[in-house]
Design a protein with these regions (language model features):
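A substrate-engagement module of RecA-like helicase motors
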Residues: 1-14, 47, 64-192, 199, ...
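Conserved pre-motif I regulatory segment
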Residues: 1-43, 57
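Walker A/P-loop NTP-binding motif
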Residues: 32-33, 52-65, 82-86
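Signature of the SF2 helicase/ATPase Hel1-core->accessory helical subdomain module
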Residues: 61, 77, 82-85, 165-166, ...
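Conserved RecA-like ASCE P-loop NTPase motor core of nucleic-acid helicases/translocases
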Residues: 66-72, 394-395, 465-472, 595-597
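A contiguous, basic/glycine-rich beta-loop/short-helix subdomain that forms a polymer-engagement track
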Residues: 159-194, 205-212, 317-440, 447-454, ...
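Conserved RecA-like P-loop NTPase helicase motor core
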Residues: 437-447, 497-602
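Conserved helicase motor "Helicase C" RecA-like lobe of SF1/SF2 P-loop NTPases
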Residues: 472-496
Length: 636
């Protein structure tokens, strides 16, 4: 099998520009062995190893049923439309390939029909999008909403015309036989290789999320790319949550049922209005948006208790009213089941004294989520692996801390796995420079953003933009963008002003832009060549100590006799930093400077752990040296 990766192998012969790499060959060997012996394997493969081909080739050669799961939909689409067909063609693979996304990624024909019938109540632009979608529904074969270019991805129409596990009518749906989810699932059941994402994999394994039985078909090989995201995503699925969005969707379905099928039951409209209003009132009690807080502490507040009681009563009323009309409308019957489910969830969320969970809430400008999350998913994930014997393969560029994979395997309860650490083949000694500038402002001192922007401006201008400024908070992101826009003539792009895809397009086409962003640009973004040669990180990405989930994990670690900083905070921050750093050098010809604006990297003992986990680039504290490197990378 390793011959596929030799200079004369199948891949080199069939793929233009394919260059064999030793780490890639080693990884392919390990994957083939793990599949052959049906055992778990954990591989950290540094950027540029070519890990995608390294797991695809042996997986296709094995002639078994394979599931490949990614952390992001972007990588999922790239795998299915680019990498998988390329390797399959090179190896003359004859098996069937399928792409499967979560239910809410497909147009729901029944909900589209309901919205068109109740259309008079929609805002003009939303109604216009619904009309466009009716015509698109007749043209699309898959119903995958990411392929619809005529309606913007942030249109309010999308949540109205896609279904969730909560509101899908399942086999009771009048349009069941034309359902895009059913078709996608059938294709996946019949396929030999299915590309999914972690959310869908876990939803199906844990929640059995579908009215159709198991979505993820029986497989012999499970491969997780971007596996560093798995522990956090798994904790969502092993917990419970209830959001105002779910409650308002429920209220909307009550309204549609009343206006289309049950016009004689006016109570439906009344209880829908009351539910929507009480959800809105509860959100207003929560105060400022963008904050994640402790639900146990929140529920001690008398005003919150009162608002929650009214929300509880409104949900109870919906349940009672829907119960009286059961059997008269498939839509209302499904809504009744959701009302029952949400009553149960709200009751569980109010039982805040159960140990082993973090109880938290967060709110955006219009919505809120109440949630409980288990402090550890190791035992649960171990059960999931035991239920599905076969090869479990986990890979990412960022799994280790200080060359040790223990933090990752322990969080998921992975035992007796083979492990492999493959360094990046890039020559960081020549291709990159790490700069931790002198005289940095303290992170929380007044005017920190102004001071930092003034310090970084000469470097960004000397590089003619072509820079990512990655921030650890939204506040710092906005403050820095404001400072840069006031003092520079280069285009300054800001995350949130348009979609992620459009921002990246603007960044690449401008050729001299500065992109100021936060967490969503720390990973899964691939900009090669001269377009990006400077990455600046505002500070070490420790999660806020006020984050209730982090607090609870630290407390749990303390109770078990561990050191919360060394075992929880530090490893999480190291892995996040490695992701951000990975944006800079994406190819053997790339050159660039990485700037980390945090003295702790060189002044605190734990800085050594961060540095040991970063690529081995030369280091400096002199901004002028960094500017010289950018002007003439080969002279260093």
């Amino acid at each position: 099998m390793a011959d596929d990766f030799s200079p004369e192998g199948q891949l080199a012969q069939a793929i233009p520009g394919f260059k064999p790499r030793e780490p890639q060959r080693q990884m392919a060997h390990a994957v083939a062995h793990a599949i052959d012996k049906a055992q778990p394997l954990v591989v950290e493969a540094g950027t540029g190893t070519g890990k995608t081909y390294a797991y695809l080739a042996p997986a296709l050669r094995a002639k078994k049923k394979v599931i490949i799961s990614t952390g992001s939909k972007a990588l999922q689409d790239q795998l299915y439309s680019r990498d998988l067909p390329t390797v399959a063609k090179a190896l003359k693979y004859k098996g069937r390939l399928a792409l499967l996304k979560g239910r809410s990624n497909y147009l729901c024909l029944e909900r589209l029909e309901q919205q068109a019938l109740a259309g008079g109540d929609l805002p003009v632009q939303t109604l216009s999008d619904v009309i466009i979608l009716r015509s698109w529904a007749n043209q699309t074969e898959e119903g995958d909403i990411s392929t619809c270019a005529s309606v913007p991805e942030d249109s309010p129409a999308w949540p109205l015309v896609t279904s969730t596990n909560d509101n899908c009518l399942g086999s009771d749906c009048p349009l069941y036989k034309d359902c895009f989810v059913v078709k996608a699932r059938k294709t996946a059941m019949d396929a030999d290789v299915v590309v999914v994402n972690h959310h869908l994999f876990l939803a199906d394994m844990v929640v059995k999320d579908s009215g159709f039985g198991e979505l993820i078909p029986e497989a012999d090989v499970m491969i997780f790319d971007e596996a560093h995201q798995l522990p956090d995503i798994a904790s969502q699925y092993f917990g419970q949550s209830l959001s105002s969005r779910q409650l308002q969707d429920l209220a909307k379905d009550f309204t549609i049922a009343y206006r289309t099928e049950l016009k004689d039951t006016q109570q439906l409209q009344k209880c829908a209005d009351r539910l929507a209003q009480s959800a809105q009132d509860f959100r207003l009690q929560l105060g400022e948006p963008g904050y994640r807080g402790n639900l146990r502490e929140l529920l001690a507040d008398k005003n919150i208790q009162r608002a929650l009681l009214l929300l509880d009563d409104a949900l109870e009323l919906c349940y009672d009213v829907a119960k009286l009309s059961l059997g008269r409308s498939a839509l209302l019957d499904a809504a009744f089941e959701r009302a029952t489910l949400y009553r149960g969830r709200l009751k569980r969320l109010k039982e805040i004294n159960q140990p082993g969970f973090s109880y938290w809430y967060e709110c955006t400008s219009r919505h809120f989520t109440l949630a409980l999350t288990p402090l550890t998913v190791a035992d649960k994930f171990k059960e999931v692996m035991a239920q599905k014997p076969g090869s479990w393969i986990f890979t990412s560029a960022t799994l280790s801390v200080n060359d040790d994979l223990h933090h990752f395997t322990e969080r998921l309860g992975i035992e007796e796995a083979e492990s492999l650490l493959l360094p990046s083949p890039f020559d960081y000694e020549k291709q990159a420079l790490l700069c931790v500038p002198r005289n940095l402002p303290l992170p929380n001192q007044p005017g920190a953003a102004r001071h930092l922007a003034a310090m970084l401006k000469p470097m960004i201008e000397a590089n003619n933009g072509r820079c990512f400024m990655l921030c650890t908070s939204h506040a710092m992101m906005r403050d820095l963008a404001e400072q840069f826009r006031a003092t520079m003539t280069l285009p300054v792009l800001l995350q949130g002003e348009t979609s992620k895809g459009q921002l990246l397009q603007q960044f690449v086409s401008a050729g001299n832009a500065l992109l100021v962003a936060t967490s969503s640009f720390w990973e899964g973004v691939d900009v090669r060549g001269d377009t990006l040669s400077l990455v600046i990180i505002d500070k070490l990405p420790f999660t806020s100590p006020d984050d209730p989930l982090l607090k609870a994990r630290m407390e749990d670690c303390r109770l078990r006799g561990g050191d919360p900083f060394d075992e929880v905070q530090l490893p999480d921050a190291v892995i996040t930093l490695k992701q951000g750093v990975g944006r800079l050098i994406r190819d053997v010809t790339d050159r660039g400077v990485l700037v980390i604006c945090d003295n702790r990297l060189v002044m605190r003992p734990y800085g050594a752990t961060f540095l040991a986990s970063l690529p081995p680039a030369p280091r400096t504290r002199d901004i002028k040296r960094a500017v010289r490197f950018l002007a003439n990378p080969t002279a260093e």
